[in-house]
Regions:
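Conserved C-terminal alpha-helix-loop-beta "cap" of PLP-dependent enzymes
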Residues: 478-572
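Conserved phosphotransfer microenvironments
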Residues: 36, 46-47, 56-131, 142-147
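Hydrophobic/aromatic residues positioned on beta-strands within the core alpha/beta folds
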Residues: 138-140
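Conserved PLP-enzyme active-site core in the AAT-like
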Residues: 43-46, 247, 277-493
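Conserved N-terminal alpha-helix of the aminotransferase class I/II PLP-enzyme fold
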Residues: 229-274
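Conserved acidic segment of CheY-like receiver
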Residues: 4-25, 29, 39-42, 49, ...
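Short acidic/histidine-rich motifs immediately flanking catalytic phosphotransfer sites
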Residues: 55-62, 342-348
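Conserved PLP-binding active-site segment in aminotransferase class I/II-type PLP enzymes
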Residues: 163-248
């Protein structure tokens, strides 16, 4: 299994499209990259190109020939695949659709949709709305080069069209280099290389690469169970080349910079003792004794502890609980606005962006109002670390909303080890030096390097295949919902069900993460303990959470289709 660099080429002149792809394709062997599969995909229309971008997660680069003819309808039809946050329609798309329907007759709408767009920068914008991580390389005429670059945002590089045909190696070289940069793992690569060298250890940890376990008649089974690599890769801060977690130097610093680039923030930091510690680091950085902080009463206990440690004064938002199903919703937007306006001297507002059950706050409203009053916004997004990487989820992302501080439990729903966490900072007033002092207070001087490496490769996966995996998961969830709709006594709860549970669900534009599958089991003639015992003991399924009337199933980046089939088979 190799990484796949699939290059989408967009040109509506068929002969020219074939000429461009043939020229680039014939140079692939020049680069001697047996470690990467390189292929090309042709699109002779914008509609087809955008369909490929939506459906083919292996696309890693786009070559766009400027002057392609595109119609308005090809761009307005760009909607998130499986956008199931609010009954298959995002709030923004639904609002625009309704407004257009009121303002135009059918004939006027048809004419407008078939109109040719006057600026191909809109095509690039459409690509970026679906896959913002995709680099777009523009081909154009020499005389238009500067005009094109001035018109369009999101261009990775520009090439004269004739030069590409005569010298295709230049653009392919650029594409491969950019692919390698995105795919880079600064810490994991350095770490792995050091371990493979098998240096003779005369430093901590005391087991010396597992020798104390391996040579013992009493505890050698511990070594055999985990295997050699776990022990030889258990290193110490004595290895200077790997850098320091508290200082963010060398390979660790480079890996953290890569995370910040992927998540589109100013700074990112690795934390190896969970988002509980990440939350406390942020709170102690921002709050002083007596400072007001507006907080969700139902937030994680680490937020309460952090407020206590800082000796700050909490102003609590009321919890909203549904006793029938045993789940909490986000606080009411009306109360959030009220407390912000009544406490304009507050230093910070802290909210849980995504609840345990997947209910999502419309954070853009919160951020905009808080920033109007000079209040910083900190979002605990522990359960929604993948939110940026698919358009069906992005509207509810804390980073996309403009929050100042965000924490992600990278071990909960993406591919890092337990206790691995990200801190993201977007605050223009960030006091980096003071943050580092607080970070050092809460951070071990002997961090587990495997956790740091897992955060590095977690970023790599989200950057390179996050969209592809999420797209497949969302498609699988939609199919599971369709199949389970046939059941008489089991039901996957949907946004309409949440709207019935919480009176503010629709008015507050609350969303739901479809990868948190909440199943209503109240119609079954079994207790939740009996259901739990059956799923665990009889079919070997360990479920995330039970209430008296629901079970919560998490689909994460490891949620293969076969797991979904096993779940369906157990419930059927």
């Amino acid at each position: 299994m190799r990484p796949h660099l699939k290059i989408l080429v967009i040109e509506d002149a068929v002969d020219l499209l074939e000429q461009i792809t043939s020229s680039i394709g014939n140079t692939i062997t020049y680069f001697d990259r047996s470690d990467v599969e390189i292929s090309l995909l042709e699109a002779n229309s914008v509609a087809k190109a955008l369909q490929f971008v939506r459906e083919d997660g292996d696309i890693q680069a786009v070559v766009f020939s400027w002057d392609v003819v595109a119609k308005v309808k090809e761009l307005t039809d760009v909607v998130p695949l499986n956008g199931v946050l609010n009954e298959n329609t995002s709030p923004a798309a639904e609002s625009v659709s309704s407004q257009n329907a009121n303002e135009k007759t059918t004939g006027e709408k048809s004419s407008a949709r078939n109109a040719v767009i006057d600026n191909n920068a809109r095509v690039i914008d459409a690509i970026k709305r679906i896959r913002p991580e995709l680099p777009v390389y523009v081909l154009g005429d020499a005389v238009k080069g500067l005009d094109i670059v001035n018109q369009a945002n999101g261009i990775e590089s520009f090439f004269y069209r004739n030069d590409i045909i005569s010298d295709p190696e230049s653009i392919l070289g650029y594409i491969i280099n950019d692919f390698d940069d995105r795919n880079e793992t600064p810490f994991w690569t350095e770490y792995k290389d050091y371990v493979v060298e098998s240096n003779d250890s005369w430093h901590t940890p005391g087991h010396s690469g597992g020798a104390s376990f391996r040579n013992s008649p009493y505890i050698s089974d511990f070594y055999r169970f985990f295997g050699r690599n776990v022990f030889v890769s258990d290193l110490s801060v004595s290895v200077d080349s790997l850098g320091s977690l508290s200082d963010g130097t060398h390979a660790i610093g480079k890996a953290q910079a890569a995370v910040a680039n992927t998540f589109e923030v100013r700074h990112s930091y690795f934390v190896t003792n969970g988002s509980s510690t990440s939350n406390k680091i942020i709170l102690q950085t921002l709050l002083r004794e007596g400072d007001k902080v507006i907080a969700d009463r139902n937030c994680h206990k680490s937020v309460h502890y952090g407020i206590i440690q800082a000796r700050a004064m909490p102003v609590y938002l009321d919890s909203v609980f549904n006793p029938e199903y045993g789940i909490f919703s986000p606080p009411r937007m009306a109360q959030i606005k009220q407390l912000i306006e009544e406490n304009t001297d507050a230093k910070l507002i802290v909210l849980t962006g995504c609840t345990y059950d997947g209910l999502l706050t419309d954070l853009k409203q919160v951020v905009n109002l808080a920033h109007e009053h000079g209040i910083k916004v900190f979002i605990d997004e522990a359960w929604f670390a993948y939110s940026l990487f698919h358009p069906a989820l992005r509207d509810y992302s804390a980073i996309a909303a403009g929050a100042d501080y965000i924490t992600h439990s990278a071990h909960k729903v993406v591919s890092a080890f337990s206790q691995a966490s990200f801190i993201h900072v977007n605050d223009p007033d960030f006091d980096k030096d003071f943050f580092k002092e607080v970070f050092a207070i809460h951070t071990s001087t002997s961090p587990k390097y495997q956790l740091i490496a897992s955060l590095d490769v977690c970023r790599q996966q989200l950057e390179m295949e996050g969209y592809k995996i999420l797209n497949e998961l969302l498609s699988n969830v939609a199919e599971l919902k369709s199949q389970m709709a046939k059941f008489k006594r089991l039901k996957i709860l949907s946004p309409s069900d949440f709207a019935n549970m919480f009176s503010h669900f629709e008015s507050d534009n609350i969303g739901h993460d479809p990868l948190k599958i909440l199943i209503d089991v109240s119609a079954l003639d079994y207790s939740n303990q009996e259901i739990h015992r059956f799923l665990m003991d009889e079919v070997g399924l360990e479920i995330e959470k039970f209430t008296h009337s629901t079970i919560l199933v998490l689909l994460t980046l490891g949620g293969m289709r076969s797991k979904i089939v096993r779940l369906y088979n157990a419930l059927k």
